[in-house]
Amino acid sequence: MSASHERQPTLDAVAPRFLVGDMEQALAFYGQLGFTSPYHDEGFAIIERDRISLQFNVSDPAHEPPEGGCRVCYISVTNIEALYQQYVPTGALRSPIQATSWGTKGFWLCDPFRNILIFGESIPEEESGTPQGG
């Protein structure tokens, strides 16, 4: 088989890894958001909900980001209004659902360790009035 016919590699999934100060606190917080943990120990955890996963490492003070720094993960969703309502009782929400100029609507929340999760959903063209894709 020639090089031009070889199967090209693909990127299949991404699992952002966040630093957390307390693993049990992180697991409890994300449990309120509907995540479950198929694996965790004192220093590392994998959490999942639907088709996404996140990973945690307990932070090492010697490797902390600069003060005021944070980590951000964008998560594409469906039925964003229902998800927002699920998260209202957690007290973690930092914004209402807002439409963007690029054809999405979304909201964001922050965990106890300054990790930010942005949830977004594409708005159908007929709803947004904004052409998508340029």
Outline where the language-model segments fall.
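Vicinal oxygen chelate
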Residues: M1-R7, A13-G21, A45-I46, E64-G134, ...
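Residues in flexible loops and secondary-structure boundaries
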Residues: L19, A26-A28, G43, Q55, ...
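Intrinsic-disorder/low-complexity coil detector
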Residues: Q8, A15, S37, D60, ...
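Short low-complexity stretches enriched in small and charged residues
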Residues: S2-D12, L27-L33, E64, Y74-S76
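Conserved short beta-strand elements that form part of the metal-binding/catalytic scaffold
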Residues: T36-C70, I116-S122
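Core segments of cupin and vicinal oxygen chelate
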Residues: T10-L11, R17-L54
